[in-house]
Amino acid sequence: MALFGSSGIRGVIGSGMTPELALKAGKALGLLHKKIVIGHDPRTSSHMIEDAMVAGMLCSGARVTRIGLVSTPTLAYAARNYDCGIMITASHNPPEYNGIKFWNPDGMAFSLKQQDELERLIESDIRGVGWEYIGSESHASNAILDHIDVILRNVEKCSLKVVVDCGCGAATTITPYVLREMGCKVISLNAQPDGFFPARDPEPIDENLSELKEAVKAFDADLGIAHDGDADRMMAVDDQGRLVTGDELLAYFCRFEVKDSVVCPVDASMVVDRCKPGVKVYRTRIGDAFVSEEVRKVNADFGGETSGTWIFPRISYCPDGIYAAAKLVELVSKNGRLSKAIADLPRYPLKRGGMKFSHGNKADIMGGIRAEIEQANSRINTLDGVRVEYPEGWVLIRPSGTEPKIRITAEAVDEGAAEKLYSQAESIVKRCIDSCAQ
């Protein structure tokens, strides 16, 4: 059974994620690395999972440093002084979930090769070292201050009014402090860590951010910032109290922060291709780890996913919602109202949907879709599903990772063209589903 998903090992406490699994993971990791730093988010199960993980690492003779309640980007930045870093978190998932994220010293998540090696060891029978070789444990308290320091060295002072919704997550330890040190007037919401996430669901999407949107208007703030449970994500609300979409925020960063090149996944809007002439756009599979890998490979200025993960390689290859918040505030201070800057971006109608199936499998269906599309089109990207480029727009057809469904996304220069591209893709998907069901 595959343990690793797109963001480490994750599951519901008591079933997909247990202390027993964390103990095995710790023993396996301790065989591969001997100097390890570990931190956690505020979930009710985080101490339990961390303790089990640490016990396993000590059992294999590792030297472990605990840095306590921190954000994921804080942990990933701290990992630069260790063989690797471990974050106990389930990020944007509901409170009953928890997980283990693995980070290299440069802020890159563990590669597929590293994951495979670790998974093989987890599934083996590791006895551990003798009593005289058991590892050691220590505590460090400077990780948050170090992260704050590197952020402040890479942004300029400004005096905006900012509302920050920490969501009762790990951002409570850092984002309000960073923005105040920058010179901002900060109004904090849900700034007490609470693993039950009583104020809102940890995922920073529109329906979960009503309080933030109202607060931005009520306090006449320049913008609002929202994080998920471990603060690797950052989303924003403009000065009118409207959530800035992930595609808009990606394009905003591209327009004002990127000089030469940007990396984004295949499902990102074509606005990123057209918002700043001369910028090279590289597209990857969906998932921040793939974006980070490509940022490093092509030496890009910036990478981002529309879910709210933003990668600034000058700091780290780990998505850093804290630095993203600070950088966004700096850019708004320099370039004027966020609502106007977003309104000035190109706009293209985008339609998302999909078709479920009860017979056949995703691989066969996608194989049929790819074969049919390849017969009629030459501009095809098959990194993640099938993306087809047209003069007026593009279509992406890809399998869902969680349900028997083929997802369809179409974007074009006008509504009619988007509807036409979507309908054409939908017809192809239906034919291939029907064919595989026979």
Swiss-Prot record:
Gene3D superfamilies documented for this protein: Alpha-D-Glucose-1,6-Bisphosphate, subunit A, domain 3, Alpha-D-phosphohexomutase, C-terminal domain
Keywords annotated in UniProt: Isomerase, Magnesium, Metal-binding, Phosphoprotein
Gene Ontology biological process terms in this record: carbohydrate metabolic process
Residues forming the catalytic site: 91 (phosphoserine intermediate)
Membrane-crossing segments per the record: none
Cofactor binding: number and manner: Binds 1 Mg(2+) ion per subunit.
Keyword Cell inner membrane: no
Post-translational modification: Activated by phosphorylation.
EC number: 5.4.2.10
Record-level Gene Ontology MF annotations: magnesium ion binding; phosphoglucosamine mutase activity
Class of this enzyme: isomerase
Ligand binding (Mg(2+)): 91, 228, 230, 232
Phosphoserine modified-residue sites: 91
Reaction(s) the record says it catalyses: alpha-D-glucosamine 1-phosphate = D-glucosamine 6-phosphate
PANTHER family: PHOSPHOMANNOMUTASE (PTHR43771:SF1)
Similarity remark: Belongs to the phosphohexose mutase family.
Known role: Catalyzes the conversion of glucosamine-6-phosphate to glucosamine-1-phosphate.
HAMAP family listed in its UniProt record: GlmM_A
Name used for this protein in its record: Probable phosphoglucosamine mutase
Naturally occurring in which organism (per UniProt): Methanocella arvoryzae (strain DSM 22066 / NBRC 105507 / MRE50)
Lineage of the species this protein comes from: Archaea, Methanobacteriati, Methanobacteriota, Stenosarchaea group, Methanomicrobia
